[in-house]
Structure formats: structure tokens, C-alpha cells
Amino acid sequence: MKTGALATFLALCLPATVFATTLRLSNEVDLLVLDGKKVSSSLLRGAESIELENGPHQLVFRVEKTIRLPGNEERLYISPPLVISFDTQLISQVNFQLPRLENEREASHFNAAPRLALLDGDAMPIPVKLDILAITSTAKVVDYEIETERYNKSAKRASLPQFATMMADDSTLLSDVSELDTVPPQSQTLTEQRLKYWFRLADPQTRHHFLQWAEKQPPS
């Protein structure tokens, strides 16, 4: 898709539905999967928030933070992938509250027994279910979407089976042909639909920045 057409396509993707929950992102949280779908890191990079509908949600993420080592040295701590499920039915804002993670001892404790909180707009705790996402794949590059689907089918602590069935077949992401001016190959259509999905979730500022970037890209 040419860049100008891409920008126009995305501009038309603004949701007609009024979203009711704002998920405030943290620069210490690497969001990997949202509600069974792999996160588009390029689209959400630098975003301060994403908009969600009211109802149950599930995040897969890693905590990434620079910690201190002996001798005034530092290293980047990356937690194991975590799964957290929660409900935003009566909540308008969700904020991460991470525990203190400043050194190797605190990082080791977090690895063994991760704990964190989600707070609403009044800084009140939101009921959550938190678990570690055990990776079954031996591939060098982990497909967190597939791993999350397996997790959600296994009746674990933070499993939400409805998000496993949603991702069982990528064809469920494809909309009617009438939404597109032309019919591209199915793989390209799926790429567009995924991009459309994440564009709709991004906050207005992130949408604006992405459209500016898209306009500057050379035509394919």
C-alpha cells in the first residue's frame, strides 16, 4: 500500500465506538500482547496510553528497568513475561504500579514471586490475576501471541479462554472486502487489519505521530 493511501486508510480507521477505559502505559513496561493479539511496537512506541472498551482484558508484558550492581555498575533487568487479567467494566483509567526494583536482590525476588498492582484513576487497586507466562517454544524468537493462546487454553490462574478462541484463526480479523478499495493478497489484508486494530487503540497523539511518519516514507 502506498504511503499516502496508508495514511488515508488509517485516518478512516478512527473508531466510531466510544472507548471508556484509558490504559496508561509505563516506560518500564514492555507490552507484548493485549487481549490475545501481538502488540504493534512500532505503532505504540512512545505512546502514553491506549484506549480500551469496558470489560475483561489481558496483558502480557515484561518489566524492564536499569538496576544497580556492586561497584556502581548498572545493567538492564528484564523480567520473565507476565500475564495479568482484569476487568474495566466500571473503570475509566488503568495505571501500572510497580514494586521497588533497584538491585539484583530485589530483581531476583521479583523473578521468583512477581507482584505489582493496577490502579484506577483514583489510585485505588483494581482486582487482578497475575501469573508468569511459561514459554514452551525453543525458537530463538518467541511468538508471544502463540504462547499466550496456549496459556489461555490451559486454565491457568490468569487465563481468559475467550482470547484464545479469538486468535485460533487469523481469518476472524479480516473484515468484509467492501472495506478495501482493492483486494490484496490475504497476507497483506491481514497485515492491514492488524495495523487498523492497533491504530484504533492508540491515543490521538500517537495516531498523529504515526501518520506524520507514514507520510514521510518513500512509496513502495
From Swiss-Prot:
One Pfam family it belongs to: DUF2057
Record's signal peptide: 1-20
Keywords recorded for this protein, A-Z: Signal
InterPro entries, alphabetized: UPF0319 (IPR018635)
Superkingdom per UniProt: Bacteria
Family of this protein: Belongs to the UPF0319 family.
Record's protein name: UPF0319 protein YccT
Organism whose genome encodes this protein: Salmonella heidelberg (strain SL476)
Gene name per UniProt: yccT
